[in-house]
Amino acid sequence: MTLHKTFGLIALLGSGETSLAGGRIFETIAQRLPRPLRIAILETPAGFELNSSQVAGRIADFLSTRLQNYQPVIDLVPARKRGTLFSPDDPTILKPLLSANLVVMGPGSPTYAVRHLKRTLAWDLVRARFRQGAGLVFSSAATIAVGSRVVPVYEIYKVGQEITSPPGLGLFADFGLSLSCVPHWNNTDGGAEVDTSRCFIGMDRFKNWLEMLPPAHTVLGLDEHTGLIIDFSSGVCTVTGVSSVSLLQKSEPEIHPAGTSFPVDRLGPIHCPDDIEEGIPAGIWKRIQQAEAETDSGSIPSEIQDLVDERKIARAAGDWARSDDLRQRIQALGWQVRDTSEGQVISSR
């Protein structure tokens, strides 16, 4: 099977993934994607929260309504924490990523997202699917996490730790870019008393953070309810939403209002991967090819069958809690299991 390189769209949101402005961005990307529209929402940025499934679930509920004309299949991907049952290295949990043509990550902690995604199976799958045309939408904490350097918002704003600029997931390094992203750029939640601009840390601390960045670095600031859609294939960035985005380099900041566009190389010198497989482990592509082959043949993937068999054993032992847990895991991977008088019946959602 031949792998074809077709970069998807990347949308970075300053905030408001479930707002009117966010909905328009999602629809803009959905219009460009083939059917069926398969959306995977990664829980990782909020994986430390006890209600991380609800955080991602709110986005899922919004998209199921906002994109209802596209009849989306929406899966939550509970890749919450390394070394647990919900690890971002667990191929069973990550199954929806193999066929998703829209991947979404949202609120949480940027530094947590980086710690639990960097050099994982989950993140490599996201990068690979993007090179096959999948759209990527990042908002809030995820917008920060995918850049070259991270603003450790909670650590500075809530805990009072010293200002640092730790490495991020480096999504744009695949294109030769040294780019960091700061959402909530024009935030005013603090009113007249506290400067909460620049993602809540305020202008003074933001300037200190800037001084820690390497040379030839670009910072992308995104106002509230504003987004930037990056199209590497056409070489164009489009600003959408209610306000503007700002580009900070050595010269004076560039401000681009909503409704305008600019060349993608304004983000920095671009070098697109010459080969779709460049920089991504060969095993990732094998997983994707296997998933495509199974979809074409209509067969039940082996990992799904294993979960179904395990559930059968749990039911025979009267372990109903385990049975329900396995059912949920099967559903999270895009399959349904029904109990009949003749046994379990498995079908794709």
Where are these regions (language model features)?
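Structural preference for alpha-helix termini/caps and helix-kink/transition segments
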Residues: 283-349
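Catalytic nucleophile loop
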Residues: 104-107, 130-151
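Portal/gating segments that form or line small-molecule/metal binding sites
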Residues: 46-105, 112
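Glycine/threonine-rich flexible loop motifs
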Residues: 110-120, 191-195
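Catalytic-core regions built around general acid/base machinery
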Residues: 95-96, 119-133
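C-terminal and late-domain segments of enzyme folds
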Residues: 1-37, 41, 45-62, 66, ...
